[in-house]
UniProtKB/Swiss-Prot annotation:
The encoding gene: CP80
Residue numbers spanned by region Disordered: 1-23
Species name: Escherichia phage 186 (Bacteriophage 186)
Zinc finger extent (dksA C4-type): 35-59
UniProt-recorded name of the protein: Uncharacterized 8.5 kDa protein in gpA 5'region
Domain of life: Viruses
Pfam families, per the entry: zf-dskA_traR
């Protein structure tokens, strides 16, 4: 028999999966084939996984780190 913690974890997992599904279905943007920052090709797997992607992984990481830094986030 499931206890309260098991039920809470199941509910949390279901919520997370629902949120991921909703986020993926909302995006109908066209992905770029070439990174807008460095002109490197963006792999097909990345374009399929993240609809609307405009940057390669490396450039996206740099943009996120800069954003975190400029917005006062800790590095």
């Amino acid at each position: 028999m499931a206890d309260a913690m098991d039920l809470a974890q199941l509910r949390e997992q279901e919520d997370r999966e629902r949120h991921i599904s909703n986020a993926r279905s909302r995006r109908h943007e066209v992905s770029a084939f070439i990174c807008e920052e460095c002109d490197a090709p963006i792999p097909e797997a990345r374009r399929r996984a993240i609809p609307g992607v405009q940057c390669c992984v490396t450039c996206q990481e740099i943009l996120e780190l800069k954003s975190k830094h400029y917005n006062g986030g800790a590095l």
